[in-house]
Every structure is written in C-alpha cells, then in structure tokens.
A protein has these predicted regions:
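Phosphate/dinucleotide-binding and metal-coordinating scaffold of catalytic cores
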Residues: 1-279, 283-377
Length: 377
C-alpha cells in the first residue's frame, strides 16, 4: 500500500502493529489487535448480537453458533461504528454492514428506543425479535454495559443515548448529567450533552459523538489500545496515569495542554468519586500532528468509591488529593499552580453538585444517597 511506501510520514495506529508488509499476529493475550477492539461492541452490543443469532438459530432449527471476535467486529453497523475504520472485501468495494435498512434512527425515535431497551431487558426468554430489531443497528456499535443506541439529531450530528436499566440502583442518566455539568464548570473539555426523561424508570443521558465532524470520521483509539494493554489493566498490575502522561509526551499533538487537562481530570475524578476511570474510558483522537486527548466521557459518581481504577503514582490509587498534588510536576504544573487548580476544582464541585442535582429533578433522598461520592477537601 502507498502508506507503507511512505513510512517516513507514517504513524502507528496500534503499538502491536509494526509498519512493515506481511502477516502480523496478535499477542497471545489479545483476541484482536486493539485497533480493531476499539471498533467492537462491548457487553450491550454483544448481547444484542448473541440474541440475534439465537433467534436466527431457532428459525432455522439449529443450535446457535458461537460468535467470534470477527463476527462482533463486522456485525457493527458501518454508519455508527466508533472511529474512522471501515471495512470492505476489496479496494473500492462496498463497505460491510452498511445496509440502509439498519440506518441510525432519528432523534424522534428516542422514546421508542428506550421502551424497546426496557422491554428487551424484561423479556425473560430473550428472544423477542420485535425489540431486538429496534435496537440492533443503533445499539450494536457501542461499548459499555448499559443499554444504549446511536441516534441522529435534526442537524445530522450523531449522538449516543444511554437508557435507564432495570438494574439501576439510582437514576444513572441524571447523575451522569450532573457530573457532566460539573466537569464543564471546572473548565474540563467535555462534549455537548442533554438529558431526556421518557418514563418513571429513569432518565436518558445523551452525548454528542466527538469522533464525527459533519460527515467526516475522526479516528479514535482508547488508551488501552495505545498503551498496548488488555481489558482489565488497572492499578492492580501497576497501570497508572503516569503511563498515560508518558504517551502524551511522546505522541501528543498538544502535549502541554493535554497533560494539564489529564491532571485536572484526575482531580475531578477524585472530587466526584468516579472509580470507573479504566483505560477504555480514556481516549485519543488522531490529528495530522499526533494524538489529541479526547473529550472527557463516561464519568459517574460512586458513593461508596474510595479508589480509582488507575494508580495516580506508580503504586497508589487512593482517592486522596495529596497524591495527585505529588505528581503534578510530571504533568507540567508547578506546586503553586497545582494547589490552586485542585482547590478550585474541589470547591466548584462542592458548591454546585446539590444545586445541579435539584435542577435535574433528583429528590432529596437521591441527593443524600449520593452525598458520599462528593468528597470534601
């Protein structure tokens, strides 16, 4: 290919894939190269695909086939696949999984999609084809465990809708919106978001896709892929924010700005007890000059949380602001700058979280149950 003939200007999309011709093999601990794993569905999308196979097997009077990683990768609808990868069998040929019959639904279908997701969850047989067909195309392309779907806004922009689940202990959508607004108040880089409520089950959190710009696709890669890690990499095996910082220093399009942003995100994660800050929940967008830290996403408060998923320094993941202050220099902040920034973020969260929760209709009881997530410093 031409890009391999011009290796002087080439860049790696995956540390496990070298820039040379010929067959390459995945590491033993990876079913797919991370480059492709980022385009695969996670638990919700895989559940939908497995249910589809079960329905098809029942119709054909056979045993359901065990789906492979390639099935999951190529079963994702092309129009809403994460990032910029597209697949075809031949150069210039039609893209796979691009059937117009499964096009991303419009915004006005949100209520129907939420109803379908709840009905699908509550269907004990797991074989209701009506609900599956509603959800498969818009929901199979997305990661995470929550019921979700891609939808198109009136202006043509692509959004992710995260629906309430029967398994929710609290209104997850509303609390994600609260934390999103807090992050914006703290000056962090966040995508556009909205909250809709269609039922008593809970709220639907909507966030604009940041890997699309009008009709242009922007390549996205998770930190898990770019660090050469596997699912489950965490503080337990020594994975830390310092690893992310090292990657930004070496490969970042805006290293100074992104290092500061990442450091502030650590403080914010502590301030709201976001303990799900694993490597899949940090991402980068490919630019002509390198990798840029993506907008903040998938941040949720956890009232009983006391540790982050990643270490702050090389060996400690405790929710303790003193830890993040100790490593501030590695992210390019002076002692004075880091103390001022941490104080400002924690103060902003403490001063505003209850007011924002009330704004989005969360009850006093719900606020009290979540109080433990918002640390006081």
């Amino acid at each position: 290919p031409q890009w391999l003939q011009e290796c002087d200007g080439a860049y790696s999309l995956d540390p496990d894939l070298a820039l040379y011709r010929g067959r390459q093999y995945t590491p033993l601990d990876k079913p797919l190269f991370g480059l492709f794993s980022d385009s695969c569905p996670d638990r919700w999308g895989r559940l939908l695909m497995r249910r589809r196979e079960a329905i098809q097997a029942r119709k054909e009077d056979r045993k359901p086939r065990k789906l492979t990683e390639s099935d999951f990768l190529l079963g994702v609808f092309d129009g809403s696949r994460m990032g910029a990868l597209r697949f075809s069998l031949e150069e210039g040929g039609p893209f796979l999984s691009n059937d117009p019959a499964f096009a991303t639904p419009p915004w006005v279908k949100l209520r129907t999609l939420e109803h379908a997701s709840l009905a699908f969850e509550n269907d004990d047989s797991g074989l209701n084809e009506q609900w599956l067909q509603q959800l498969l195309a818009p929901g199979s392309s997305l990661g995470g465990a929550r019921p979700k779907a891609s939808v198109l806004a009136a202006d043509g922009s692509l959004w992710i809708a995260k629906f309430p689940s029967k398994n929710d202990e609290y209104n997850s959508g509303a609390w994600e919106m609260v934390v999103h607004e807090l992050a914006k108040l703290c000056g962090l880089h966040v995508p556009e978001a909205k909250l809709e409520t269609f039922s008593k089950t809970g709220s639907t959190f909507l966030v604009k896709r940041f890997d699309r710009k009008v009709s242009q696709r922007i390549h996205f890669a998770s930190a898990m892929t770019l660090l050469g890690k596997t699912d489950g990499a965490s503080a337990a095996d020594g994975t830390s924010y310092l690893d992310l910082a090292s990657f930004i220093r070496s490969n970042g399009a805006n290293p100074t700005e992104d290092l500061r942003e990442l450091w502030k995100r650590i403080v914010f994660n502590m301030a709201v007890s976001n303990t799900d800050d694993h490597l899949r929940n940090h991402g980068f967008l490919l630019t002509p000059t390198g990798w840029a830290l993506s907008p903040l996403y998938d941040v949720n408060p956890v009232p009983e949380g006391n540790c982050l998923s990643l270490n702050v320094n090389e060996e400690d993941n405790s929710i303790d602001i003193s830890l993040v202050l100790e490593v501030a220099g590695y992210f390019g902040l002076t002692e004075q700058e880091s103390e001022a920034a941490a104080t400002e973020i924690c103060h902003t969260v403490q001063e505003n979280w209850e007011k924002i929760a009330q704004k989005y209709g969360l009850s006093r009881g719900a606020v009290e149950r979540m109080r433990g997530a918002f640390i006081e410093e």
